[in-house]
């Protein structure tokens, strides 16, 4: 168990972000999952009708499976090929609801900046010991949260490559 009171921030509540949160829980760390969308897997839902090219057995992280099974979750057929919607409904939503993750999930929290608190690019002495200051935008405005580490699982869905790039 880690005695650091600050959480580890995970940016994004898609498959990778929630798997990271589950792994943090397994290792005794507190996650703080910051999702820009209004639901877990928000980017996945935008292509929810598309069938994923890998079966369920390759899409469920071991630490996530452990948390889910403790809550009574029954895994889908490992050889089946889910759609994006299936992935959200049968895996991400139940994972986000487990008691080890649910209280640490913040929907509608768009991360706009990550820095070391009290430091800029020119100031380096002591930087490694400073917490991360994460600026988030919500419907209520801008705020700052602190974390001891940051995992960026925000994905690339919001950063498309233009034609010809």
What does each model-found stretch correspond to?
Residues 1-8, 26, 123-125, 158-165:
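Extreme N-terminal leader/targeting segments of oxidoreductases
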Residues 37-90:
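Glycine-rich active-site loop/strand segments that organize a redox cofactor
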Residues 16, 39, 157:
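Conserved Rossmann-like nucleotide-cofactor binding loop
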Residues 11-14, 36, 107, 147:
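A secondary-structure boundary/capping signal
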Residues 20, 43, 116, 161-163:
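Short glycine-/acidic-enriched loop or helix-start segments at secondary-structure transitions
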Residues 6-33:
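N-terminal Rossmann-like FAD-binding beta1-loop-alpha1 element of flavoenzymes
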Residues 74-159:
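Feature captures the FAD/FMN-dependent oxidoreductase FAD-binding
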